[in-house]
Amino acid sequence: MSKHQTQVVGDFTIGPEIGRGSFANVYKGYDNRTKAPVAVKSVFRSRLKNQKLVENLEIEISILKNLKNPHIVALLDCVKTDQYFHLFMEYCSLGDLSYFIRRRDQLVQTHPLISSILERYPSPPNSHGLNKVLVVNFLKQLASALEFLRDQNLVHRDIKPQNLLLSPPVHSKEEFKRKGYSGLWELPVLKIADFGFARFLPSTSMAETLCGSPLYMAPEILRYEKYNAKADLWSVGAVIYEMSVGKPPFRASNHVELLRKIEKSKDEITFPVSAEVPDDLVRLICGLLKANPTERMGFQEFFNDPLIVYDVQCADEPLECSNVDEQLFISEYLPNLKTSPPAKPAPETIKEESEEEERAERAPTDSLLIGKEADLRIPRPMEGSGKDEVIKKLINKSSPPPDTVKDGQIKKGARRDKDDFVYEKDYVVVEKRTVEVNAIADELAKAGAGAVAIPSPHLGTNEHSAANPSGPTETQTQRRFSPSSRTSSIGSNRRPSWGDRKMPISISPTNALTKALGYTSNRLFGQQQQQPQQAQQAAIESAITNVTTNLLATKTLRPLKPSQETSLEDTEVINQLELLATMAHAISLFAEVKFSQLIPLPPSSSSPGSADYDEMYQNDAFPPQMVKSISSEGVALYVETLSLLAKAMSIASDWWHQNSSKPSTSPKLNDLVQWIRSRFNESLEKAEFLRLRLADANEQLVGESGSSLNKPVVAEKLIFDRALEMSRTAAMNELKNEDLLGCELSYSTAIWMLEALLSNDEEPVTGNEKLDAEDKKIIELFINSIGNRLKVLRQKIDKQGVRS
C-alpha cells in the first residue's frame, strides 16, 4: 500500500504512512464507527520468513490484548489479510520520545504545543537534554508502566526512546485523575509500545535470549550471561540519561565495542557540564547504570525513589494548545520533511581511535578471546560447528568499525550510488539460480535406491524447489561451470591449490566426511530408523557443516584416491564440491559478521526456521549511513558466497546430466548437494534481508539529505583485507606463543578466503575476470607465505603437543 492510498480493513480506514521498519510500516487511520484516530501497524507476511518471527508477533498480540494500563499503548483490534497482519493501536500523535528530543528545536517553531512546553520548561543553555520537570514527568509515567508489568511478571526487554510514545496532555486535572495517569497533568503522556521482545519472566527466573537495542542493552545481555528483569532497569537508566543529556550514555559502532566501553567506564558515568543534570537525577542514573546487575538498583528501590514518589513543583496550569490539531501526526508540523519521521535516532558512532589505541585493540591477547567477553552477536548456521563461532570472532576482531558519516559525504539531491546498481545486477543473477539449484538437489535426493536413498531436506521447498518433477531441463543442466572448465577445481587445467603446491595431505578430508556421514547414516538407517525427518536432516547438516568447518582448519584439498564406496568419477566430483563448499563457508562466515551487526543474535541460535532463531527485528541503533555501509558489504559478501555455491551446484548438475542413468547415487555426494542447497537458500534469504535494509537506508538518505557518496564496495577487497588482517593477528599471537590453535584456524581461514578469490574470479553479470594478472600474482604470493607460516606453526603445535 502506498503512502497516500486509503484502504478499508474491518472497521477501520488506513491512511498515510507515519513510520516504517524492515518488517512493518505504521499508518495513521481512523475508526469508521467513532471517527477516532488510530495507529495501524501493518506487518508484512512476506517478511516473516520463519516461524520464530510469526511467534514473536503472536506473543506481542496476546500480551497487548491483556494489558490495560494508561501508560501502555492499547491494542484495539487485529485483522489478518493475505498480505498483512494489521494491528490497530492507540494513536499517539506526538510520536516517540526520541523524535521529541531530536526535533524539538524545529518543532518549537511550528508546533504550538511543543512551543508552549519548551517555553514554560526550557532546557539548560547549551544543553541537548530536557528540562528536569519534563524528565521527571516522563520518568514517573515510565515507572508506573514498569510497576504494572512487574505485577504481571512481564519483562519488556526493549526499553528505548523509540518505543516510548507520547500523547498530548489531557484537558483537565479531573480527566487526568479519572484515567489513572501518573506524572504532571498538564504535560504530554508517555506510553510504552512494541512488546515484540516481551516475555513472562517471574522475579526469580533468568533468561538468556539476546534481544533489545544495543545502545540500551544491559551489559549482562551483551556478555551472554543469564539475566533477569533487572535488565530493563539498565535500559531505563540509559533512557533517563538520554532525556537529561540528549544522547545515550554509551555509543559505539558495534556490540563488542559497546561492551568494552561499558566495562572500561567501571560504573563511572560522565555527564556534560553543559547539560546541568541535577544531583538527584545523577544519583538515580548512576544507580541504574551499574554493570553488575547485583549492584544495580532493584525494582522496589527504583519505585520508591524520591523522584518518583514525591511531587515535583510545576506551574499546575494548562498549556496553550488551542491551535493544536491532535489528529495531526507530529512530523506533519514540519513541512520540509516527509510524512514518515526519519530513521530512528542516529547515535553518533565512535570516533577513530588513535594509532596507539588501535594497536592496543589489536593486541594478540585480545584478538583471539574465546570466552564470554569475546562473544559476538552472530547467527550460527549449524549447531554442530563450534569452530564457526571462533572463526567469526577472529574475523570480527580483525574488522574495523563500519564507515561513519563524515563531513561532505552527504549531498542533497545526489543520485544513488552506481555500485548499488552493480550489486543489484549481481544479486539478481545469483537469485535467478535458485530454481536450478533446488531442482538438481531435488533430483539427486530422489535418485537413491533402498537404504542409501537420502531424503530431501525440504528447507525452503515451498518457496525454492523446482516445480517440475520430471528432472532438470537441458538448459538447467548445461551450466557455465563444468568439471573441465578453467574454474573447476580438478583436471589438467586446474590451478594448483596451495595444498598441492606446498605440502602433502596427512588426513583425507573426504575420509573425515565419510566417518561423519557413516556415523550419521548409522543413526539414520540403523538402530534409529524411526527418527523424524527433521531430526534426520539436522543430523546430516550438522555432520556436513562440521566437516566443512574442519576443512578450514585442516589441509587444503587434493584429488583423492578412489575408495571401495565411491567411484573415481564420483570422488572427483565430491572433491570439487568440498573445495567450493569450504570456500563458500569461509566467505559466508565473514558475511554473517555483517549480518549479525544489523540483527543481533546469540551464538546458540541456528538456522532460520529453528526454535532457537531469535527475533529478526531491525537494529534501530545505527544511523542510515552506517546501515548502508554494513548492508552493502554484507550483500556483496553473500553474492560471493552464492556464486561459489551456484558454481558447485553447476558441477553437480553437469555430473548428474552425464550419470542420471545410474541406479543410485553416492550418499556422500547427495549429502553434499543437499548441504549446498540448504546453504544457498539460507544465504539468499539473509542477502535479501540485507538488500531490503540497504534499500531502506538509501531511501532515508535520499529523503533526508541526499544519497551518500561512499567509495564503492568491492567484495574482493573486503575479503583480501580481512584475510591479511587475520593473518597478521595470528602472527602476533604466534610470536608470543599464545593460542596456537587459534592461530592455526586464522591462517587456515585466511588461505581459504584467498583461494576463494582465485576460484571465483568471474563477474556474475558480464562474465569478465574480476582480477587482473597482477592481482592474482599478489594473492598467490600471500597464499604461499601464509601457507609456509601455517606449516611451521603445525610443526610447533605437534612438537608442543598442544592438540592433546
UniProtKB/Swiss-Prot annotation:
<keyword id="KW-0813">Transport</keyword>
<comment type="function">
    <text>Serine/threonine protein kinase involved in the cytoplasm to vacuole transport (Cvt) and found to be essential in autophagy, where it is required for the formation of autophagosomes. Involved in the clearance of protein aggregates which cannot be efficiently cleared by the proteasome. Required for selective autophagic degradation of the nucleus (nucleophagy) as well as for mitophagy which contributes to regulate mitochondrial quantity and quality by eliminating the mitochondria to a basal level to fulfill cellular energy requirements and preventing excess ROS production.</text>
</comment>
<dbReference type="GO" id="GO:0106310">
    <property type="term" value="F:protein serine kinase activity"/>
</dbReference>
<dbReference type="InterPro" id="IPR048941">
    <property type="entry name" value="ATG1-like_MIT2"/>
</dbReference>
<dbReference type="InterPro" id="IPR000719">
    <property type="entry name" value="Prot_kinase_dom"/>
</dbReference>
<keyword id="KW-0067">ATP-binding</keyword>
<feature type="region of interest" description="Disordered">
    <location>
        <begin position="455"/>
        <end position="506"/>
    </location>
</feature>
<dbReference type="Pfam" id="PF21127">
    <property type="entry name" value="ATG1-like_MIT2"/>
</dbReference>
<dbReference type="GO" id="GO:0004674">
    <property type="term" value="F:protein serine/threonine kinase activity"/>
</dbReference>
<dbReference type="GO" id="GO:0000045">
    <property type="term" value="P:autophagosome assembly"/>
</dbReference>
<keyword id="KW-0808">Transferase</keyword>
<feature type="region of interest" description="Disordered">
    <location>
        <begin position="339"/>
        <end position="364"/>
    </location>
</feature>
<dbReference type="GO" id="GO:0005829">
    <property type="term" value="C:cytosol"/>
</dbReference>
<dbReference type="GO" id="GO:0010506">
    <property type="term" value="P:regulation of autophagy"/>
</dbReference>
<keyword id="KW-0472">Membrane</keyword>
<keyword id="KW-0547">Nucleotide-binding</keyword>
<dbReference type="GO" id="GO:0034727">
    <property type="term" value="P:piecemeal microautophagy of the nucleus"/>
</dbReference>
<dbReference type="InterPro" id="IPR008271">
    <property type="entry name" value="Ser/Thr_kinase_AS"/>
</dbReference>
<dbReference type="GO" id="GO:0042594">
    <property type="term" value="P:response to starvation"/>
</dbReference>
<dbReference type="GO" id="GO:0015031">
    <property type="term" value="P:protein transport"/>
</dbReference>
<dbReference type="GO" id="GO:0030447">
    <property type="term" value="P:filamentous growth"/>
</dbReference>
<feature type="compositionally biased region" description="Basic and acidic residues">
    <location>
        <begin position="404"/>
        <end position="415"/>
    </location>
</feature>
<feature type="binding site">
    <location>
        <begin position="18"/>
        <end position="26"/>
    </location>
    <ligand>
        <name>ATP</name>
    </ligand>
</feature>
<comment type="similarity">
    <text>Belongs to the protein kinase superfamily. Ser/Thr protein kinase family. APG1/unc-51/ULK1 subfamily.</text>
</comment>
<comment type="subunit">
    <text>Homodimer. Forms a ternary complex with ATG13 and ATG17.</text>
</comment>
<dbReference type="Pfam" id="PF00069">
    <property type="entry name" value="Pkinase"/>
</dbReference>
<dbReference type="Pfam" id="PF12063">
    <property type="entry name" value="ATG1-like_MIT1"/>
</dbReference>
<dbReference type="GO" id="GO:0061709">
    <property type="term" value="P:reticulophagy"/>
</dbReference>
<feature type="compositionally biased region" description="Polar residues">
    <location>
        <begin position="462"/>
        <end position="495"/>
    </location>
</feature>
<feature type="domain" description="Protein kinase">
    <location>
        <begin position="12"/>
        <end position="308"/>
    </location>
</feature>
<feature type="binding site">
    <location>
        <position position="41"/>
    </location>
    <ligand>
        <name>ATP</name>
    </ligand>
</feature>
<dbReference type="GO" id="GO:0005524">
    <property type="term" value="F:ATP binding"/>
</dbReference>
<keyword id="KW-0963">Cytoplasm</keyword>
<dbReference type="GO" id="GO:0000422">
    <property type="term" value="P:autophagy of mitochondrion"/>
</dbReference>
<dbReference type="InterPro" id="IPR045269">
    <property type="entry name" value="Atg1-like"/>
</dbReference>
<keyword id="KW-0723">Serine/threonine-protein kinase</keyword>
<dbReference type="GO" id="GO:0005776">
    <property type="term" value="C:autophagosome"/>
</dbReference>
<feature type="region of interest" description="Disordered">
    <location>
        <begin position="395"/>
        <end position="415"/>
    </location>
</feature>
<keyword id="KW-0072">Autophagy</keyword>
<dbReference type="InterPro" id="IPR011009">
    <property type="entry name" value="Kinase-like_dom_sf"/>
</dbReference>
<keyword id="KW-0653">Protein transport</keyword>
<dbReference type="InterPro" id="IPR017441">
    <property type="entry name" value="Protein_kinase_ATP_BS"/>
</dbReference>
